[in-house]
């Protein structure tokens, strides 16, 4: 079954690029034609690139990786938060803070501070403080939640990033490339394809387009999580022997290894028949005795 259909792409306006005067010549190979001063993206290529990106994301997550969803423009914020939350992945929908990836150790300390403030609020620690102190803590917590709330459970840099609009998120893309983190992103006609490892040519300005492609990536994450869970169950379900089988006795195991011989049977074996000559002598003796 196809990840997404041509009809879905058309209905979401994925094929609409930017005006012809606002384009990156490197995107020429992804452009189908020009109509009314707007470039039309080749959706046949988009379909193949979607499959490629889908497989990469699925395999990454299946092997224990995480994908960071990034989209701070208004058209992408809702889809980024909704789809990332659906599959339990971190996301950034507000302003990207410089160093979120390259200086993650410092960011992680701020995440710990956010959790500390949440703990104070839950345990009622603010009640023993003055109103001014309570206000300061409340504002600090709100600010941290707004900027770092989407990555609050992220304990290390992600295995890959999904980006809506690489031009707007150029700082995030630059940090990912600096750390060697694969970038999966929508490539509009004004973007630089050299910055992206797994491009998906398409419209990054329309709400429906960004939502559709973000959902596709989230579906890939979901498939990867299912594959990971299946592999874990398979590993746990490998018994050394079948549940209903009795274990082999030690002498049986020795026979399998080619050591020793089987022990004598417990039942008494019948006596061997005497040789013909001995039998004849016994008969003569018996006759003599009788006489």
Swiss-Prot record:
One of its GO terms (biological process) is translation. It comes from Frankia alni (strain DSM 45986 / CECT 9034 / ACN14a). The keyword Ion transport does not apply. One of its GO terms (molecular function) is structural constituent of ribosome. NCBIfam families: rpsB_bact. The keyword Cell cycle does not apply. HAMAP family: Ribosomal_uS2_B. GO terms for cellular component: cytosolic small ribosomal subunit. This is Small ribosomal subunit protein uS2. Keywords: Ribonucleoprotein, Ribosomal protein. Residues 256-291 are annotated as: Disordered. SUPFAM superfamilies: Ribosomal protein S2 (SSF52313). The gene is rpsB. Belongs to the universal ribosomal protein uS2 family. It holds the Pfam family Ribosomal_S2. Residues 261-291 have a biased composition (Low complexity).
């Amino acid at each position: 079954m196809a990840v997404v259909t041509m009809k879905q792409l058309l209905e979401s306006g994925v094929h609409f690029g930017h005006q012809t005067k606002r384009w990156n010549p490197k995107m020429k190979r992804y452009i189908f034609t020009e109509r009314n001063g707007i470039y039309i993206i080749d959706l046949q290529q988009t379909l193949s690139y979607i499959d490629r990106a889908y497989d990469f994301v699925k395999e990454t997550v299946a092997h224990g990786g995480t994908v960071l969803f990034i989209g701070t423009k208004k058209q992408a914020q809702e889809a980024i938060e909704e789809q990332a939350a659906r599959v339990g992945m971190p996301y950034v929908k507000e302003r990207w803070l410089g160093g979120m990836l390259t200086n993650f150790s410092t960011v992680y300390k701020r995440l710990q501070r956010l959790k500390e403030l949440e703990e104070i609020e839950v345990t009622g620690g603010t009640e023993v403080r003055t109103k001014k102190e309570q206000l300061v803590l409340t504002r600090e917590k709100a600010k941290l939640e707004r900027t770092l709330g989407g990555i609050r459970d992220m304990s290390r840099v992600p295995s890959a990033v999904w980006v809506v609009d690489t031009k707007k998120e150029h700082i995030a893309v630059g940090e990912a490339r600096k750390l060697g983190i694969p970038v999966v992103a929508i490539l509009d006609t004004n973007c630089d394809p050299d910055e992206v490892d797994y491009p998906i040519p398409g419209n990054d300005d329309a709400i429906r387009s960004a939502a559709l492609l973000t959902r596709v990536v989230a579906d890939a994450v979901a498939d990867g999580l299912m594959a990971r869970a299946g592999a874990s169950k398979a590993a746990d379900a490998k018994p050394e022997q079948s549940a209903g089988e009795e274990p082999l006795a030690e002498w049986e195991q020795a026979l399998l290894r080619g050591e020793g011989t089987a022990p004598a049977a417990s039942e008494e074996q019948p006596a061997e028949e005497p040789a013909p000559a001995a039998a004849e002598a016994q008969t003569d003796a018996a006759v003599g005795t009788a006489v």
